[in-house]
Amino acid sequence: MEGWEVTVSHVDYPPGRVGAVHHHAGFVLAYVLEGAIITKVSGQGEEKTYNVGQMFYEQPGATHEVSKNASQTQPAKLLAMIFAKKGSTLTMPGRAQ
């Protein structure tokens, strides 16, 4: 896809971590590497728990309303792949407009 790029990030969730509400400029595929992540993305229903080996998707402009480690005692990790136009700000705080 000309003019687009993929950025791959390793995201660590220490025990009990709750991420801030945010949104992305592009498509996101997230793959859980360790532990379990609770997530809620606008337009995708209620909170859902994803475990090791599972993936979730965020459409461009959707608000990532909940992003937290399901455990208070164990870490969690995921691999986030963001597909966006070159030069885009990948992650922005707050709700999408």
Q: Over which residues does each language-model region extend?
A:
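Extracytoplasmic
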Residues: 3-8, 24-27, 61, 76-78
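Extracellular/periplasmic catalytic domains that process cell-envelope and extracellular macromolecules
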Residues: 1, 23, 31, 48-49, ...
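Ligand-binding loop in jelly-roll beta-barrel domains
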Residues: 62-88
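Histidine-centered metal-chelating micro-motifs
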Residues: 18-20, 38, 46, 56-69
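Glycine- and acidic-residue-biased ligand/ion/polar-headgroup-sensing regions
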Residues: 24-44, 52-54
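A short glycine-rich, His/Asp/Glu-containing loop-to-beta-strand
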Residues: 1-21
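Short acidic-glycine-tyrosine-enriched beta hairpin
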Residues: 2-3, 13, 43-61
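Short, low-complexity, Pro/Ser/Thr/Gly-rich segments in the mature regions of secreted, periplasmic
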Residues: 87-97
